[in-house]
From Swiss-Prot:
Residue positions with a glycan: N630, N689, N709, N721, N1167, N1269, N1343, N1347, N1434
Protein name listed in UniProt: Peroxidasin
Cofactor(s) needed: Ca(2+); heme b
Binding-site list for Ca(2+): D817, T896, Y898, D900, S902
SUPFAM superfamilies: FnI-like domain, Heme-dependent peroxidases, Immunoglobulin, L domain-like
Swiss-Prot/TrEMBL catalytic activity: L-lysyl-[collagen] + L-methionyl-[collagen] + H2O2 = [collagen]-L-lysyl-N-S-L-methionyl-[collagen] + 2 H2O + H(+); bromide + H2O2 = hypobromite + H2O; L-lysyl-[collagen] + L-methionyl-[collagen] + hypobromite = [collagen]-L-lysyl-N-S-L-methionyl-[collagen] + bromide + H2O + H(+); L-tyrosyl-[protein] + bromide + H2O2 + H(+) = 3-bromo-L-tyrosyl-[protein] + 2 H2O
Domain Ig-like C2-type: 236-324, 332-418, 423-510, 515-600
Amino acid sequence: MAGAGSWLYLTAGLLVVALPQLSHSCPSRCLCFRTTVRCMHLMLESVPAVPPHTTILDLRFNRIKDIQTGAFKHLKNLNTLLLNNNQIKRIPSEAFKDLENLKYLYLYKNEIQSIDRQAFKGLASLEQLYLHFNQIETLEPESFNYLPKLERLFLHNNRITHLVPGTFSQLESMKRLRLDSNALHCDCEILWLADLLKIYSESGNAQAAATCEYPRRLQGRSVSTITPSELNCERPRITSEPQDVDVTFGNTVYFTCRAEGNPKPEIIWLRNNNELSMKDDSRLNLLNDGTLMIQNTKETDQGIYQCMAKNVAGEVKTHEVTLRYYGTPATPTFVIQPQNTEVLVGESVTLECSATGQPHPRVTWTRGDRTPLPSDPRINITPSGGLYIQNVNQDDAGEYTCFATNSVETIHSTAYIIVQAVPQFTVVPQDRNVFEGHTVDFHCEAQGNPKPVIAWTKGGNQLSVDRRHQVLSSGTLRILRVALHDQGQYECQAVNIVGSKSTAAQLIVQTRVTPVFATVPNDMTVEVGTDVQIPCSSQGDPLPIITWNKDGIQVTESGKFHISPHGYLAIRDAGLADQGRYECVARNPIGYSSVSMVLSVLVPEVSRTGDPFVATSIIEAIATVDRAINSTRTHLFDSRPRSPGDLLALFRYPRDPYTVEQARAAEIFERTLQLIQDHVQSGLMVDLNGTSYHYNDLVSPQYLNMIANLSGCATHRRINNCSNMCFHQKYRTHDGTCNNLQHPMWGASLTAFERLLKSVYENGFNLPRGISGRIYNGFPLPLPRLVSTTLIGTHTITPDEQFTHMLMQWGQFLDHDLDSTVVALSQARFSDGQDCSVVCTNDAPCFPIMVPPNDPRVRNNARCMSMVRSSPVCGSGMTSLLMNSVYPREQMNQLTSYIDASNVYGSSDHESNEIRDSASHRGLLKQGIVQRSGKPLLPFATGPPTECMRDENESPIPCFLAGDHRANEQLGLTSMHTLWFREHNRIATELLRLNPHWDGDTIYHETRKIVGAQMQHITYSHWLPKIFGDVGMKMLGEYKSYDPNVNAGILNEFATAAFRFGHTLINPILYRLDEKFEPIPQGHVPLHRAFFSPFRIVNEGGIDPLLRGLIGVAAKMRVTSQLLNTELTEKLFSMAHAVALDLAALNVQRGRDHGIPPYHDFRVFCNLSTVQTFDDLRNEIKNPDVREKLKRLYGSPLNIDLFPALMVEDLIPGSRLGPTLMCLLTTQFRNIRDGDRFWYENPGVFTAAQLTQIKQTSLARVLCDNGDNITKVQHDLFRVAEFPHGYVSCKNIAKMDLRVWQDCCEDCRTRGQFSTFSNHFRGKRSTEHSYKEDNKEPSSLLNQSVNTTCNTEQPKNLPHVNDFKEFVLDMQKTITGLRKQIKKLESRLSNTDCTDETGESHSTKEKWNKDACTKCECYNGHITCFVKSCPPVNCSRPQRIEGVCCPVCTDDKIQST
């Protein structure tokens, strides 16, 4: 016992010793061990203070009733807290704050009745919470919101009857939940718990227990098995809805909302789609019946209100209502602004927009360009102002603007709808079959949003990485120099973020096989009148196409020529005109080969079938032609024009008598042969237009010469004299002769048009295609009027975004400098003198345009539009220039073919004399009345009534007189003529000021030369680049030099079809604008009222309004479906009670009149692909509707007329031309430039300084200098500019400085006399060097004086009469001395030998060495010596050796040896 007592005592002692060490941290009577504090059964009434490092705190079995705030402060390390078996009644908010690491909390077997909302806030690590065996009746919905890691929650054996939805919704880590042994009422409000328990059960991650206590029928049922049908739950339904309210400041607003449902719905109010919080604003009250009461209303209360009724079975909303607040007027402000929104195709989208203001603003929507929304049932505006679009498509993408408008102001906000779409192919690649070495393009384009990226693969694999495979920015795959291994399938993929699409095409590569001739032609000689077949065939892969050329001009299918499928050329009725060199050309995509032969035609001396009828026929032809011409003259000039046909004939009637006589002679010649044909036909009883008749058998060559003499053809041949080189080296002739000294008639006026291809006539000579109803390639040719109405005419006009109407006007003005076809002088048929417009038959010279049945524009049952054929050239149609053979009909160009300002000066001496002011001797052109601006108009034409006086009700003012007879055709053209006539007089006046010693002729010709150069520069440097674009300018090429082998003559195809493309640029209205570029009071002029109306210039403001209209208004864009406006096709030269003409139909008919080959032949000439079907045209005419129209009209692509086909070709990018038209125009303009000896860039035409100044000129400068009062223009008159920003003052437009034309000479007394050009001026009265029209001497005398010196001088000062005797003596002495000198010169000239400076004589052609370095030669009395040039020496001391010209390096040679 003693030992035991000692042990106890020791233990007690140790305890006593240890306790003092822990007394400052361990609560009294508690047991503390390390971090565990146990205070059980101590009757504690509050939580004691414990050490901060405590991890386990056991407070069980005490009498704790309340948990004080901060009771567990600083216990951040606490892991387990045991508070069970106490007397706690309430868990206050944030009772366990700072216990962030607490995992286990025991609160069971207390007396807990309530738990505040945020009681467990801060317990982020809590995993287990035990609250069972308490007296809890309700739980706040946020009680367990802050327990993310809670896995176990025990609430069984409490008094819980209802649970608020969402009570456990935040417990994401829950694994076990116990709610059993509660008095749960299983009604509709507990369905949320049933759903939660089912989720726990299905997932298997958590266990839960909850049973129903009430109603009795469900007692003991697991809550998870309860269904809504068992509880009779009902979704809310609205029984009373709110209405819009208008309120003023301070009033009270009531919004009524009543709803029924099971359980009773909760009423929630929304404002502008946001829930209203009644607690945040004491003015807001929710009454028991759901009514929203707003007291003391303020401006901020206005907006969109909506009531929502909600219970566990669902929710429902009322319609939106508006509270409008009316206080002080206030500008609108946006409550909700639209936002950029992305949407997929096919889905719906809403752009929200609402606004407030006083009064309440009205909300409207537009597209971004302020255009109204389309009327589309898919598009609606919501009651709140939002824009709602259903089933969105790609067109809905773009900018939308919301406008909020009240009486104070309008505000707007913009947003974009971005429609995202899966890529869709717009262009898919086509299978290609090409030859190796060629380049192939696979076109592939797609659309989508975002814009898809194009990628290419071959056979599913990446393309070869080499420079031959290129993917262009457009998506096109280009393979250069195709090789055999490139063959295969190529896939195009279009990819964007929404999706991708793929398509494929095959490439087949063929080996190259160039054409090889299988049959070659040989030279042939045949008799006149026989049919000839020239063999030629070729092989190759692909099969070559055979074409034939005669003397460099391509042969086309016609009544004269036929090319068989094998390539054989058949020539019908061979004549002398057919002999020459023929070339057979075999062409395929790989290359071409050619072979040629010579055809000779013999003319036997035998009589012909028509010889007996020559005499009577020529007499009858002269009588009938003269009768018809005189009848036409009387009809046209003795009265006012009665019809559009009269008007057309009158303004195109030649003014030059020589032209009239030449045309008359040609008509008589052709009429004579026609009469002979008629006589022969009546005897043979055969159809002369048939294939069985041979024209070369008609008349013998000697009779053809007789007909030529009697008709006047031989009489009116021009004999050109180009011997006056003092003139021809410096200036042009008016008629264009002697420009090309090797070929004086090339490019001259009144000569035949040139041709690229042989003419096509039905009979091979003069009968137009389609005139006899013949079938071509299985189809008849359509009526030209039908072509116009079906294909060409348009009411719709698309403005050109780049170029002004001046682009058209310069083209017309230029055309009138290049070509004008001489038409028949008679408007009546030769056979009986009846008017062509009345009889409507194709009897010479009538060629009417027949009107289809039911044409909408025909009046008075008219059957045709009047038209006569172009006059033939003497020597064509029936005869050659030798007058002994039959040649195809050719037409006559009345103008020079050069750009020489002939539209200003005329194309003949007769015309130039009419418009020159010869009386003033100042080199001016005649001028008319002077306007208020101080600037003159053109002079009026004199003579009989003109086309400008067709309507006496408008004005009696006659036509203006200018260099071209068409100057009055329309007001814009007349304005251009006025500009350039003033430009001539302006330059001439300045040149006279600079060179007062020049005479009138010199000033005139120098000015004419400058004006022509200005027009050349404007055309090629400013105008053509707009028409041709970069592609065409490269085809045209740079100017190199004058080429005398280039014929600058105008091509028939150019004048008759190609250059008429300008008709597609014409607007239907001529605009007239004032200084502010606003319409003038008299208004604009419809085009059909602008024809032949000079009175509008005289009486209605001059030329300035018209010029501003040309530079200030866009031209008409050439669109394949919008070609010629109806002012040209329906109202051309319209007059009352008459059928107006149709320009498009005239163009088609004129092409057939001139024998222009079909479009297909020009495709071959221009190296485009041949076509067999209309789909073969798809590369040049992409519009399928246009191709279908062509098919309906022509039946075969081989029949299409040239003019309409050129007009419907798609434009080459950057140009205003299609590919064939580009080919024809570049060919013509290259010839015009390169074949002109006086081209302004040709060295020697102008000095370098003068050329520099000419290149300063511009149409803008001409407009500034010569308009009535134009002060502002754009730099480039051809480009569209916005007024006034795109315009500049005329002061800023570069000028041409004429001072470089000033003579700098010591003795200017005779310099500048027209007869003293350059250093070879002549005396004023020197006949041998006079200008042609001043020279009265016979040409024979002129020819004898060609070697006479051009320089003669007059005495400087004549002596006074008193000194006359001395003067005579001096003159006699001078004459005697001159005679001696002349005799010496004559003796020297008569001797062809030479005498050198030493006096030694040498015979002609003798050569001798004057010294070692000089060799001389005698030739025709002149000695010419040549001095040898020595190379540089490479030694320090070169040596000269006698007899050797050049020094040698002797030292070097010695050293080297």
